[in-house]
């Protein structure tokens, strides 16, 4: 697997060694202090507060549709992080298809490798498939070369395995980032997508429950929300149809990430 990824990385090196060195050195001017994304919930359905250590907008990074939020436009974005399969993704896709709702699935290369048919189905049914790196790495801990390999390698593998291009969006694994990693991601042609709404749904042995998920959405949904969910969650799979129905009943529509500006 590593040799295959290294070959993918090499195919992206179309510039000279001299230019490569200059490019690598350029990122040394950016802080690589590791930050972990956080947000502050608003009980009144207002926009979430967020980590403002870095102005992420300078790097084509988003956590909220700011335009929709300012206009109080009832639009939300569903996103799912997919590190591995736990038997619920096709159920999620069935619900999204039934409700005619788009989503973005952030996948690792290992997820694609083990679930090619599901990854193809995501694209065939009109969803976006974003980048979650090859091995779900902590990006600030990696060298420039390793980041390029992880990001471009995942995108290349998506195309080779499914025949579909990966959409130009990346979610940093574990929400860990720095000014340096945001700059590199931007220069690789990807927009970084954080989130303004999430909950503890990723531990398959400690699920929050269907009622909790429905109640959480009822309490904290807001205009322009980018919602983080995990595909491995039985609670998400069980609650999703009701969550969508409730939001539609309040006049919300579900948008694709390409609407972000």
PLM region descriptions:
Residues 85-88, 113, 136-137, 176-179, ...:
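Active-site environment of divalent metal-dependent phosphoester hydrolases
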Residues 222-258:
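Catalytic grooves of carbohydrate-active enzymes
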Residues 81, 96, 129, 170-173, ...:
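Divalent metal-coordination and catalytic microenvironments
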Residues 176, 181-220, 252-261:
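His/Asp/Glu-enriched short active-site or ligand-binding loop at hydrolase and phosphoryl-transfer sites
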Residues 52-142, 146, 150-159, 164-167, ...:
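Active-site beta->alpha N-cap acidic-glycine motif
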Residues 1-79, 85-91, 98, 114, ...:
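N-terminal pre-catalytic segment of deacetylase/amide-hydrolase enzymes
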Residues 128-135, 175, 229-232:
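Histidine-centered catalytic micro-motifs
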């Amino acid at each position: 697997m590593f040799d295959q990824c290294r070959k993918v990385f090499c195919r992206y090196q179309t510039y000279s060694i001299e230019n490569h060195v200059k490019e690598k050195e350029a990122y040394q001017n950016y802080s690589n202090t590791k930050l972990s994304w956080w947000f502050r919930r608003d009980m009144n359905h207002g926009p979430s507060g967020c980590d403002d250590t870095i102005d992420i907008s300078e790097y084509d990074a988003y956590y909220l549709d700011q335009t929709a939020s300012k206009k109080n436009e009832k639009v939300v974005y569903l996103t799912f992080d997919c590190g591995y399969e736990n038997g619920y993704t096709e159920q999620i896709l069935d619900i999204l298809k039934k409700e005619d709702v788009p989503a973005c699935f952030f996948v690792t290369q290992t997820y694609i490798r083990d679930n090619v048919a599901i990854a193809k189905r995501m694209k065939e049914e009109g969803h976006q498939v974003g980048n979650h790196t090859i091995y779900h790495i902590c990006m600030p801990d990696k060298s420039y070369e390793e980041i390029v390999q992880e990001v471009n390698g995942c995108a290349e593998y998506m195309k080779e395995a499914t025949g579909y291009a990966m959409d130009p969006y990346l979610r940093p694994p574990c929400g860990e980032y720095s000014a340096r990693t945001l700059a590199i991601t931007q220069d690789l042609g990807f927009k970084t997508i954080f989130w303004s709404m999430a909950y503890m749904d990723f531990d398959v042995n400690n699920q929050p429950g269907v009622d909790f998920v429905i109640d959480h959405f009822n309490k904290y949904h807001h205009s322009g929300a980018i919602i983080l969910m995990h595909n491995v969650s039985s609670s998400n799979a069980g609650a999703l149809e009701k969550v969508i129905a409730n939001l539609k009943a309040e006049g919300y529509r579900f948008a694709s990430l390409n609407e972000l500006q």
